[in-house]
Amino acid sequence: MILSDRDIKTYINSKKLVINPLSEDTIRENGVDLKIGNEIVRIKENMEKEVGDEFIIYPNEHVLLTTKEYIKLSNDIIAFCNLRSTFARKGLLIPPTIVDAGFEGQLTIELVGSSIPVKLKSGERFLHLIFARTLTPVEKPYNGKYQKQKGVTLAKED
């Protein structure tokens, strides 16, 4: 079942869903918009974090971004990450991304550049999370290697 804005507010008030910081205006009809954090990593041979208020995503470039918000999902909620249409209309892409029940942390999202340079600003709403409730709480909530991550987190070996 997809959560409505009312459901999302109920989950937030009961602490079953935590989004910090949370702006009331980011709670949408059927999801929550998340903002770009202030870190980026360009995926190339020498991957270094860049910290700033603005970033240019160059044509066909692959980057990792982080969300400004730290989230925590209870063991009966998952989230689907979608790029807001404003950015998709500029030609940017993200791969299908699911946030598992029990996840806690800032999200690291891969973004693929357009055919033209695109400027991103820290604090811009760029992701739309759609929350869904599982029929029953999961037996084994997420407790993987990216649990409680902060900032852009590079791939970790298994």
Swiss-Prot record:
What are the protein's UniProt keywords? Hydrolase, Magnesium, Metal-binding, Nucleotide metabolism
Q: What is this protein called?
A: Probable deoxyuridine 5'-triphosphate nucleotidohydrolase
Instruction: Write down the EC number.
Output: 3.6.1.23
Cited function: This enzyme is involved in nucleotide metabolism: it produces dUMP, the immediate precursor of thymidine nucleotides and it decreases the intracellular concentration of dUTP so that uracil cannot be incorporated into DNA. It does probably not deaminate dCTP.
State the species of origin: Sulfolobus islandicus rod-shaped virus 1
- The answer, when asked if Glycosyltransferase is one of the entry's keywords, is no
Annotated GO MF terms? dCTP deaminase activity; dUTP diphosphatase activity; metal ion binding
Give the top-level enzyme category: hydrolase
- Catalytic reactions of this protein: dUTP + H2O = dUMP + diphosphate + H(+)
Query: Which pathway does this chain act in?
Result: Pyrimidine metabolism; dUMP biosynthesis; dUMP from dCTP (dUTP route): step 1/2
Q: Give an example GO biological process.
A: dUTP biosynthetic process
SUPFAM superfamilies, alphabetized: dUTPase-like
CC cofactor: Mg(2+)
Query: InterPro entries from the entry?
Result: dCTP_deaminase, dUTPase-like_sf, dUTPase_trimeric
Family that this chain belongs to: Belongs to the dUTPase family.
Q: Which Pfam families match?
A: DCD
Entries under NCBIfam families matching the protein: dCTP_deam (TIGR02274)
